[in-house]
Amino acid sequence: MSDLLSRRLALLGAAANLPLLTECLHGIERECLRVDSDGKLALTPHPRALGSTLTHPQITTDYSEALLEFITPTETDVADTLADLERIHRFASSKLDGEYLWSPSMPCELPDEESIPIARYGSSLIGRLKYVYRKGLALRYGKTMQCIAGIHYNFSLPERLWPLLRQAEGSELSERDYQSAAYIALIRNFRRYSWLLMYLFGASPALDAGFLRGRPSQLERLDEHTLYLPYATSLRMSDLGYQNNAQAGLTPCYNDLQSYIDSLRQAVSTPYPPYEKVGTKQDGEWVQLNTNILQIENEYYSSIRPKRVTYTGERPVQALAARGVQYVEVRCLDINPFLPLGIDLDEARFLDAFLLFCAFSDSPLLNGECSDATDNFLAVVKEGRRPGLQLQRRGQPVELQVWANELLERIADTAALLDRARGGEAHAAALAAQRAKVADAELTPSAQVLKVMRERGESFEAFSLRQSREHAEYFRQHPLAAEEQARFEKMASDSLAEQTELERDQDGDFDTFVAAYQASILGLISN
């Protein structure tokens, strides 16, 4: 164990401080496509019975009208987070009217690009802005790529913990800056070690052959309708032939919060010639919010983000600049197609131990390690189960299995501390399950997906539809209690009323609204 990690764990293990570890906050966002009874993309509007996608706090859409997004409230116990997520699934399933929630991350058979419906948010200015932003994504990256679904894991350490560490370490930074620097250090370590999550939880080794739209790739054919890589863990997180040159130079290495903010500010205000050629309007219709490298900060694609809850009308980068980092959002997790929620308690508890390990371990600046971190991540998503696979650690080759076992040995200390804080051995058990996967790659979700498809002679689509139907049956057999169902019905109707009120009471025209939105980031830069 590193000196810094051991010192911090000893400090938090003291009787007076141990309860702090029960105050970490969790939230999960799960995306999933709606499909029809044949497993084709649902072309129906977002079900009105689920409420307004603009104003509902827990049920919205991501890119497409058919790409649902379920958002849990924050909880200190991740078991409560998963219970929240299950309630949302049960309610949504009860309103789908013959449609299913698609079980894996990679999409079903998709119609042609033009027919994939972009999510709609009504006629309010903010609703229209969200729609035009998505039109811009279609223009820049194509609609097909936007139909990939994932799980986002939001995690924060208790606010009371940072002053304790700051004082113990004699830091001269302000409390806010110390906290931000600590989260950025967590993110640097996440970049170093997130390949391990791809090995353990990657669950997208195969996809529907039509997804590539005929483009050449390194993928092999499993059957007439399925492409795969034999040792892949997460094709979702690989490049899959998508190279967006505009974002190529955008690689913040997270040396400090300010440099991260500056790189995003620059990207959302720097014109990109190919986008300038298109312009923001065609035939008088908006096609993208601006012609810059990024339309808004959230367009930047990354496996983890520093976050701060925003105020109404505030942009993410404004919130970070004004109040510092509050939590991290892990964005690289595949949906496990064998699980009704796409994630379970073992995975969540391991993630907690992993993120605490990243937060408390020494985290030097990445600098030269940046390219190694990227290369390791890409190697594992494409061939993580290849026997003897070598990764790069501080410029030296190391076998994945050796490095993974060393990391799990160190993460065991944070898992043990979490168990001491909460009682029981749940985190140690979650860690043991991951050790078993390192010892035997056949136990990983990616290997299990290929094993089942081969044993049953199923295409990716057939496997996924069967899993989707099984999960629908699970939710049907576990309906919400009447009181819970009524609470969700009210949330849906309240959100519709809120959207109606927003549309009725707004002032101003859309062009002025977009100009003001753009000016908010330009104002930040000039300050």
From Swiss-Prot:
Belongs to the glutamate--cysteine ligase type 1 family. Type 1 subfamily. Pathway: Sulfur metabolism; glutathione biosynthesis; glutathione from L-cysteine and L-glutamate: step 1/2. Keywords: ATP-binding, Glutathione biosynthesis, Ligase, Nucleotide-binding. This is Glutamate--cysteine ligase. Pfam families: Glu_cys_ligase. GO terms for cellular component: cytosol. GO terms for molecular function: ATP binding; glutamate-cysteine ligase activity; metal ion binding. It is an enzyme of class 6 (ligase). It comes from the Bacteria. Its EC number is 6.3.2.2. SUPFAM superfamilies: Glutamine synthetase/guanido kinase. InterPro entries: Gln_synth/guanido_kin_cat_dom, Glu_cys_ligase, Glut_cys_ligase. One of its GO terms (biological process) is glutathione biosynthetic process. It catalyses: L-cysteine + L-glutamate + ATP = gamma-L-glutamyl-L-cysteine + ADP + phosphate + H(+). The keyword Kinase does not apply.
